[in-house]
Amino acid sequence: MAIKIYKPTTNGRRHMTSSDFAEITKTKPEKTLLESQSHTAGRNSYGHITVRHRGGGHKQKYRIIDFKRNKDNTKAVVKAIEYDPNRTANIALLHYTDGIKAYILAPKGLKVGDIVESGDSVDIKPGNALALKNIPSGTSIHNIELKPGKGGQLVRSAGASAQVLGVDGDYTLVRLQSGEVRKILSSCRATIGVVGNEQHSLIKLGKAGRKRWLGKRPQSRGSVMNPNDHPHGGGEGKAPVGRPQPMTPWGKKARGIKTRDTKKASEKLIIRRRKGSK
């Protein structure tokens, strides 16, 4: 992937960048692997806003991704690398030898014509999926399961990867992108390699409208709201917070509060917290 830089023909184009989509080999998705999806604009079934700053955006079809990678001992050919509007990573279209088609996250270096497979004794190469206990220490992995058979939940964004550190009894030690070292059951599966489209984080949207296409609405500061909308609101002109410390929109302390429940069941599986945490 390379970054495409635009000429500053307008204010919106100035500093704007995008992907050149050089890796994309097919523009129309596989119809049998599509599902319709409806957007709720951050509302629940009562119509109340539960997630702020969402709404609008371009209509999209959901691509059904195979996160489980449980089709063992059956080789698949990479037929295409496609764009997926629902995620930052690109996706790869697989054709299995038994006629089944599936999408997977496209790892860095995967090309059309490559062979990928899943199982306990497959080669350690990008795109292959196997249990953590069969992956050598130091290997970069992505799409990691937390429960055997549930499907990959960790490390799925563009450019992300984790590293296998070693085995500790029934668990495998994995260093995540954040720096956190965590125990994961050795029977859980992961995919070899780094997630592709690694320069996605360098893209600059350039204008507000491009953000709206993604379904993201503007975010206002609490200090410019009315007092019935936010604890920081109200006052004459640029008024201070008016409280001992900043508050969330729902009246809770915004700083100094732990963001993770210390009684969470998975707490004992975390060997070292992420970088910057206390």
Swiss-Prot record:
Feature: compositional bias, Basic and acidic residues: 258-270
Keywords, sorted A to Z: Ribonucleoprotein, Ribosomal protein, RNA-binding, rRNA-binding
Listed GO CC annotations: large ribosomal subunit
A single MF term (Gene Ontology): structural constituent of ribosome
Example GO biological process: cytoplasmic translation
InterPro entries attached to this UniProt entry: NA-bd_OB-fold, Rib_uL2_dom2, Ribosomal_uL2, Ribosomal_uL2_bac/org-type, Ribosomal_uL2_C, Ribosomal_uL2_CS, Ribosomal_uL2_dom3, Ribosomal_uL2_RNA-bd_dom
A Pfam family assignment: Ribosomal_L2
SMART domains for the chain: Ribosomal_L2 (SM01383), Ribosomal_L2_C (SM01382)
Positions of region (Disordered): 211-278
Family: Belongs to the universal ribosomal protein uL2 family.
Record's subunit section: Part of the 50S ribosomal subunit. Forms a bridge to the 30S subunit in the 70S ribosome.
Function: One of the primary rRNA binding proteins. Required for association of the 30S and 50S subunits to form the 70S ribosome, for tRNA binding and peptide bond formation. It has been suggested to have peptidyltransferase activity; this is somewhat controversial. Makes several contacts with the 16S rRNA in the 70S ribosome.
Name of the featured protein: Large ribosomal subunit protein uL2
